[in-house]
Every structure is written in C-alpha cells, then in structure tokens.
Amino acid sequence: MADTKEMKKILFAPFLDNNPIALQVLGVCSALAVTTKLETAFVMTLAVMFVTAFSNLFVSLIRNHIPNSVRIIVQMAIIASLVIVVDQVLKAFVYDISKQLSVFVGLIITNCIVMGRAEAYAMKSAPLPSFIDGVGNGLGYGFVLITVAFFRELLGSGKLFGVEVLPLVSDGGWYQPNGLMLLAPSAFFLIGFMIWAIRIIRPAQVEAKE
C-alpha cells in the first residue's frame, strides 16, 4: 500500500505540486512553438513523455555502471537514441504533424525536463520509480501544453483538433478569430495565467518576499 501511494505521488506531483513548466520554468520554448493546435501539442506530449520515461528507465538500470566523469554523455546518448526513434515513428505514421513539429522533436534532446529528470532522479532511484517519474513529468508538461493549445486554437481559429467549434464570420457565423492567439506571445500570457491560477491553488509555491 505504501509503495502504491508513493508511486501515485511520483506520478501526479508534476501536475500541480512540481510542474516542470509552471513551477520549474523548463521546456518553455516548445510550449510557445507547438501549441497553436491541439493535435501538435498532444503529439509533442506523447513524444516527450515517451523519451522522459524510457530515458529515466534506461539511465536508472545502468546508473551503477556509469563512470561519474561521463554520466552526462551517456545520458545524452540514451536520450538522443530515443528521440531518433520518436522522430522516425512520427515521420512514418503522422508525417503531416511531424512536419508541423519541425525541429522541435529533435530539440527534445536538449529539453531541460528530460535531462533534469535523468540527472536529478533516475541516477539516484530504482528503475520503476524512475519510469513513473518520467511518465509523470511528461504528463505534467503535457497538461500545460494541451491547456495552452486548447485556448490558442479555440480562440485563434474557432476550431479544436481542426474541427470548427465556433461558427466563423467568414462562414456566416458570429465568431471572429483572434489572430493574436496564434502568435507566440499569447502562449506566454496563457502560461502566466496558468502559473497564477496554480499558485492560488497551491500558495506554498509563491516565492517569499526578499
């Protein structure tokens, strides 16, 4: 029972209590770039979750055999290999989305969330908790991405997953798309609002005044 509770805590903590974007402010670049549509945000979430979970698992499995002097290189090699697999799978099965994600799939290699969890958690923990931690941080990252993408696509184009939800003026409806929501600065504002909302729910995350 204790192990189950601990696993649940590891899995769900990255949503609100220790969100990699909202609290740690990591992975923000991709949050700006891939959140104009829900489908790209969803696929990016799956990609990051896969890479984070399995890089954590593999790093944890060999952590006692990695010389300290080359541990970062080994972690990078594992992460890069997983990213290549993800990139090839996306190109094979969802080529159009892969083109929209462009270089940001490859840049998962340098994503601070992935590297941070491998170094800070997987190097010190057993394989199963490390894997769960990777899944949790991928989901926490995706929680922000998908929330931001929901509002950007809905308000920016009147659509969700490419399907018209709000009747557009151009089609005789009442909604005029807000082009600002499709620009990168809108993601900054939305992430800021999310951080504000999370810190209302979790006051302990508010930094102490100097």
Swiss-Prot record:
GO molecular function: oxidoreductase activity, acting on NAD(P)H, quinone or similar compound as acceptor
EC number: 7.2.1.1
BP GO annotations: sodium ion transport
Pfam families for the chain: Rnf-Nqr
Membrane topology listed for this record: Multi-pass membrane protein
UniProt-annotated location(s): Cell inner membrane
Entry GO terms, CC: plasma membrane
RNA-binding listed as a keyword: no
Source organism superkingdom: Bacteria
Transmembrane segments: 10-30, 42-62, 72-92, 103-123, 131-151, 178-198
Keywords per UniProt: Cell inner membrane, Cell membrane, Ion transport, Membrane, NAD, Sodium, Sodium transport, Translocase, Transmembrane, Transmembrane helix, Transport, Ubiquinone
Quaternary structure and partners: Composed of six subunits; NqrA, NqrB, NqrC, NqrD, NqrE and NqrF.
Main function: NQR complex catalyzes the reduction of ubiquinone-1 to ubiquinol by two successive reactions, coupled with the transport of Na(+) ions from the cytoplasm to the periplasm. NqrA to NqrE are probably involved in the second step, the conversion of ubisemiquinone to ubiquinol.
Recorded family membership: Belongs to the NqrDE/RnfAE family.
Designated name of the protein: Na(+)-translocating NADH-quinone reductase subunit D
Source species: Photobacterium profundum (strain SS9)
Gene designation per UniProt: nqrD
